Design a protein with these regions (language model features):
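Hydrophobic core of alpha-helical transmembrane segments in multi-pass integral membrane proteins
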Residues: 1-8
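Transmembrane helix-loop-helix hairpins at the membrane interface
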Residues: 22-127
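Membrane-interface interhelical connector segments
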Residues: 9-26
Length: 127
C-alpha cells in the first residue's frame, strides 16, 4: 500500500495525515468506520469522477483538474498541505482508473477500500 510507504518516509505527510485523521476518526466508534469507508468513497467518486470529470472532459486534463479539486477538498488548514498533495495524487490514480476503464465502479471500490483500510489502521494505532 503506497500510503503506508509515504506515511513512513515523509514526516510532514505523516503529521498532516495524523491531524486530519484524528479530526475525522477520533470521535467515531468502530462501526462508524464502515460508513467512513462507504459514504465518502461513493459520494466523492460520484462527484469528482462521475460528474466533474465528464463535465470538464474525459481526458487527462479533466483528470488533472478534478484531482486538484479533490485534493483541495481535503484541506483542513494551511499546515495540512502535505495531505492535500497526497489526496491529489490519489485523485489522479482514481481519475486515471475511471478514464482508462470507462467504469466508475473501479475508482469507487478503490476509494472505499482505501478509506476502510486507512481508517482501520489509524484507529488500531491511535485508538
Amino acid at each position: 500500500m503506497a500510503s503506508a510507504g509515504v506515511y513512513r518516509l515523509w514526516p510532514q505527510y505523516r503529521q498532516s495525515a495524523d491531524v486530519y485523521l484524528e479530526l475525522v476518526l477520533q470521535p467515531l466508534i468502530w462501526m462508524d468506520l464502515l460508513w467512513m469507508g462507504l459514504l465518502p468513497g461513493l459520494s466523492e467518486e460520484l462527484l469528482f469522477r462521475g460528474v466533474m470529470l465528464p463535465a470538464i472532459g474525459l481526458n487527462w486534463t479533466g483528470v488533472i483538474f478534478s484531482s486538484l479539486c479533490f485534493g483541495v477538498l481535503h484541506l483542513s488548514g494551511l499546515q495540512q498541505w502535505p495531505y492535500v498533495v497526497w489526496a491529489t495524487v490519489v485523485g489522479l490514480a482514481f481519475g486515471g482508473s475511471a478514464l482508462m476503464t470507462g467504469n466508475l465502479l473501479v475508482p469507487v471500490v478503490a476509494h472505499i477500500i482505501t478509506n476502510l483500510l486507512s481508517s482501520l489502521i489509524w484507529k488500531v494505532r491511535h485508538g
